[in-house]
């Protein structure tokens, strides 16, 4: 049975947002760590036995491009820094962590980073599958719009029956904005985060293209619900655009969707590797 969006998912995402780079929450249960290596950010999240976020570290970073870790040393350094911070804050030691990868790419890419940071990988799965598992979906589609890629998964009877990855995401939105404003790409990334309402007319065509890509992948799949995840979905206007494009579907865009994939990854470790938790 799918988790209730308002009663189960939304409070956890709100808690993750509130904990981001802040003092951890208290918990008296075992803890599990998940690491999300994104194109625009690296997020490490700790959850407890109730699937509640306990601690969140986030760094905006350009270490992954198109599903490839192009700055391996930078990625390892960030994960190691997150690990040191979390262990110091929580007073425990993490030996294992879960992670993910974009559909169609080599999972060893993410695994190698975590192992080089001193962690054993307890569980690895593709990003939209992680979200589908977190939400316990059935007869639904998951669209994870990240920084560099858009992952798509179809879930039937609790199992992922189809997944794909397209090379379009927040990075392409920044490129469009940089060209329109005639500013450097790094400046466009910052401008995008602080002027979301203002930039919608400029970036809307990019999201329209994403919606058409999604339409191609879900055509004929017979799904009833479409779930949106990923930091790039937090742009105002995205939910309305997808609702307009897919009027026959129930479109869901939870608050703080940036943290949905990290929450899903951490909980995949909790669900699949119950004996491997912080000591």
Curated annotation (Swiss-Prot):
Disruption phenotype: Not required for aerobic growth on ethanolamine (EA) supplemented with cobalamin (vitamin B12). A double eutJ-eutG deletion is not required for growth in the above conditions. A double eutG-eutH deletion is not required for growth in the above conditions. Slightly attenuated in a mouse model of infection. A non-polar deletion mutant grows on EA from pH 5.5 to pH 8.0, but does not grow at pH 8.5, no change in acetaldehyde release on EA plus vitamin B12. It comes from the Bacteria. Keywords: Chaperone. InterPro entries: ATPase_NBD, EutJ, FtsA/MreB. CDD domains: ASKHA_NBD_EutJ. Induction: Part of the 17-gene eut operon transcribed from a single promoter, induced by ethanolamine and adenosylcobalamin (AdoCbl, vitamin B12). One of its GO terms (biological process) is ethanolamine catabolic process. Gene3D superfamilies: 3.30.420.40. May protect ethanolamine ammonia-lyase (EAL, eutB-eutC) from inhibition, may function in assembling the bacterial microcompartment and/or in refolding EAL, suggesting it may have chaperone activity. Overexpression of eutJ and eutS in E.coli leads to multiple BMC-like structures; eutS expression alone leads to 1 BMC-like structure per cell. Belongs to the EutJ family. This is Ethanolamine utilization protein EutJ. It comes from Salmonella typhimurium (strain LT2 / SGSC1412 / ATCC 700720). The lineage of its organism: Bacteria, Pseudomonadati, Pseudomonadota, Gammaproteobacteria, Enterobacterales.
């Amino acid at each position: 049975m799918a988790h209730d969006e308002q009663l189960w998912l939304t409070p956890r995402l709100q808690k993750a947002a509130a904990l981001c780079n802040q003092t951890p929450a208290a918990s008296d249960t075992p803890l599990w760590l998940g690491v999300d290596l994104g194109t625009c950010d690296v997020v490490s999240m700790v959850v407890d036995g109730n699937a509640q976020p306990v601690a969140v570290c986030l760094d905006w970073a350009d270490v992954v491009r198109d599903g490839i870790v192009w700055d391996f040393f930078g990625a390892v350094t960030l994960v190691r820094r997150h690990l040191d911070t979390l262990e110091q804050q929580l007073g425990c030691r993490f030996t294992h962590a879960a992670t993910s990868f974009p559909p169609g790419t080599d999972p060893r890419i993410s695994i190698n980073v975590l192992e080089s940071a001193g962690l054993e990988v307890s569980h690895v799965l593709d990003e939209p599958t992680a979200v589908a598992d977190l939400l316990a979906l059935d007869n639904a589609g998951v669209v994870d719009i990240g920084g560099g890629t858009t992952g798509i998964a179809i879930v039937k009877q609790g199992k992922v029956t189809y997944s794909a990855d397209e090379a379009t995401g927040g990075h392409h939105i920044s490129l469009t904005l940089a060209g329109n404003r005639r500013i450097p790409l790094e400046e466009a990334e910052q401008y995008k985060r602080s002027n979301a309402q203002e930039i919608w007319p400029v970036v809307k065509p990019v999201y329209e293209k994403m919606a058409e890509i999604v339409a191609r992948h879900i055509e004929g799949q017979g799904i009833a619900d479409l779930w949106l995840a990923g930091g790039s979905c937090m742009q105002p206007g995205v939910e309305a655009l997808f609702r307009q494009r897919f009027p026959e579907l129930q479109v869901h865009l939870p608050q703080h969707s940036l943290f949905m994939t990290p929450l899903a990854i951490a909980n995949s470790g909790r669900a699949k590797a119950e004996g491997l938790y912080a000591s």
